[in-house]
C-alpha cells in the first residue's frame, strides 16, 4: 500500500512539473500572502486498533511567511472500536500538529506542490464497556486508560486548483495517515 501511494505521488508531481507553465509569477498557484484552509480524510494511520475504524478527519490552516515557505497547524480526530466477546474497547485519537512547508513549483497557475515537516501531539484514550455483569461487578462499569505522545510528521503534497479559490488536496507521508485527500480554500 505504501509503495502504491509513493509511486502515485511521484507520478502526480512529475506530471505537474511537465505541464506547460505560464512565465508570469502572478500566475503561480501559491503566493506569499496566501492563507489556506483545508479539510479532508486520512488513510492508514499508525496505531489504530479494532475492527471498526473511523479514519482521521482533519482540518488544517497555513499561511505564507516567505516567498515559498508556509507555516500552519492541523487538528485531526480518529476513533476505532473492537468487540472482543465479553466487552467492547473504544479508542479515541485527537491530533494537534504544527507544520511548515516549502512550495517548490513556479509558473504553474493551477498546481501547487510542496514538501514539509511538522511536530504533533497525539492524545490517545481507550475505554472498555463490559458485556458480562460479572466483569462489571469485579472491574467496575468502565475501564479506561490514556497515553499521549509527540510525533514527527513528514509529508509531500499537492493541490490542484479547479477555481481561483478551491483546490483538491493530496498528501502522502507519515503522521496523520499515510495518505490524505481533501479540499482546500484560499481565504484571501
Residue ranges, per PLM feature:
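Short glycine/proline- and aromatic-enriched beta-strand/turn motifs that initiate or cap beta-hairpins
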Residues: 21-63, 103, 175, 182-188
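Extracellular loop and loop/strand-boundary signature of outer-membrane beta-barrel proteins
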Residues: 44-46, 83-89, 139-144, 167-169
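Solvent-exposed loop segments that connect transmembrane elements
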Residues: 129-145
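Cleavable N-terminal export/targeting peptides
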Residues: 1-33
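Short hydrophobic/aromatic segments of transmembrane alpha-helices and their interfaces
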Residues: 6-8, 52-53, 150-151
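Gram-negative (and chloroplast) outer-membrane scaffold detector with strong preference
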Residues: 36, 43, 55-134, 160-162, ...
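Gram-negative outer-membrane beta-barrel domains
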Residues: 62, 102-112, 122-124, 141-188
Amino acid at each position: 500500500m505504501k509503495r502504491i501511494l509513493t509511486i502515485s505521488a511521484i507520478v502526480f508531481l512529475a506530471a505537474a512539473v511537465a505541464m506547460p507553465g505560464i512565465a508570469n509569477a502572478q500566475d503561480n498557484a501559491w503566493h506569499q500572502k496566501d492563507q489556506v484552509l483545508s479539510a479532508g480524510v486520512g488513510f492508514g494511520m499508525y496505531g489504530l486498533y479494532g475492527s471498526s475504524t473511523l479514519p482521521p478527519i482533519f482540518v488544517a490552516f497555513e499561511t505564507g511567511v516567505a516567498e515559498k515557505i508556509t507555516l500552519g497547524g492541523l487538528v485531526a480526530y480518529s476513533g476505532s472500536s473492537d468487540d472482543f466477546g465479553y466487552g467492547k474497547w473504544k479508542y479515541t485519537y485527537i491530533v494537534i500538529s504544527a507544520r511548515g512547508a516549502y512550495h517548490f513549483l513556479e509558473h504553474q497557475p493551477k498546481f501547487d506542490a510542496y514538501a514539509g515537516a511538522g511536530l504533533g501531539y497525539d492524545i490517545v484514550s481507550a475505554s472498555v464497556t463490559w458485556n458480562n455483569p460479572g466483569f462489571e461487578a469485579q472491574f467496575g462499569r468502565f475501564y479506561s486508560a490514556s497515553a499521549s505522545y509527540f510525533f514527527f510528521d513528514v509529508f509531500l503534497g499537492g493541490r490542484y486548483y479547479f477555481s481561483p479559490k478551491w483546490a483538491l488536496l493530496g498528501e502522502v507521508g507519515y503522521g496523520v495517515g499515510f495518505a490524505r485527500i481533501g479540499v482546500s480554500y484560499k481565504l484571501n
